Amino acid sequence: SGKPYVIENVPGAPLIKPVQFCGSSFGLMVRRHRLFESNVPLVGSVCDHKTQGRPVGIYGSMRDEIPSGGHTAKTIEQAREAMGIDWMLWGDLVEAIPPRYTFEIGKQLMSVLK
């Protein structure tokens, strides 16, 4: 169709020339790496894990310990804050993309499509 598109998926997914976004780049407490493919040039974010501190996991069950260190969110409030989302329940948060990612993608798309 020639219209702009963006496809999101997880690392390892078969996308064409994807860019990656990470919550640590935006000051979020999640390391939710996501890939984005587009027919419009996008610039991904650079991970900032070293200054992020111990990330909060938003998957599985709340209050789980993570074998490699860290934990999943202890409360729904902690999960919402880590993701930058204040309206979702746990079941929605575990499937969500932080809005900061889509804000950045939208900003980049708008600058190209002007």
Predicted features along the sequence, with ranges:
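Class I S-adenosyl-L-methionine
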Residues: S1-L113
